From Swiss-Prot:
Name assigned to this protein: Endoribonuclease YbeY
PANTHER family: ENDORIBONUCLEASE YBEY, CHLOROPLASTIC
Species this protein is from: Anaplasma phagocytophilum (strain HZ)
Keywords, sorted A to Z: Cytoplasm, Endonuclease, Hydrolase, Metal-binding, Nuclease, Ribosome biogenesis, rRNA processing, Zinc
Residues engaged in binding Zn(2+): H114, H118, H124
Length: 154
């Protein structure tokens, strides 16, 4: 089950120890826990910065500001599928961590799990879907000894 990781911004190496291996481990953990690892999907993770996420957010969502995570689903879940691509911004991640008073690694893990759920088809556009997605995030994060991020934001 390949998880391909590209590190576009070198700042990731100062913030996350072994960003490639850490990203792979978190994605594989989420896929295992969600019981979709048996499909052996390919997932791509791009560790980027605000400039790239601003460009992608504007191009694909018509939103002219950077964001913390963007996910693109490429294929429906099937054996050996190219499931999707997850982009993370180091700038948003570090800013939000400081603002929320959350450890960077915990926020990184949360955003990566959030991205995995998006490429699996979960969304948070309507309240019922948001509750389902948040419940999954909270459960997965708790299994990694990370507290509920939605309590912190209140």
């Amino acid at each position: 089950m390949p998880v391909e990781v590209s590190t576009i911004d070198r700042k990731w190496y100062r913030i996350i120890r072994k960003p490639k291996a850490t990203s792979q481990e978190i994605v594989l953990f989420a896929l295992r826990e969600l019981k979709v690892d048996r499909y052996n999907p390919i997932v791509s993770v791009v560790l980027a910065h605000d400039a790239l996420l601003l460009e992608l957010n504007h191009k694909y969502r018509n939103i002219n500001k950077p964001t913390n995570v963007l996910s693109f689903n490429y294929e429906a879940l099937s054996h050996n599928c190219c499931l999707g691509e997850i982009f993370l911004s180091i700038d948003r991640l570090t800013y939000e961590s400081k603002t929320l008073g959350v450890e960077v690694h915990a926020h990184f893990t949360h955003m990566l799990i959030h991205g995995v759920l998006h490429i699996l088809g979960y969304d948070h556009e309507v309240p019922e879907d948001a509750q389902e997605m948040q419940a999954l995030e909270i459960d997965l994060l708790s299994k990694r000894s990370i507290e509920n991020p939605y309590l912190i934001q209140e």
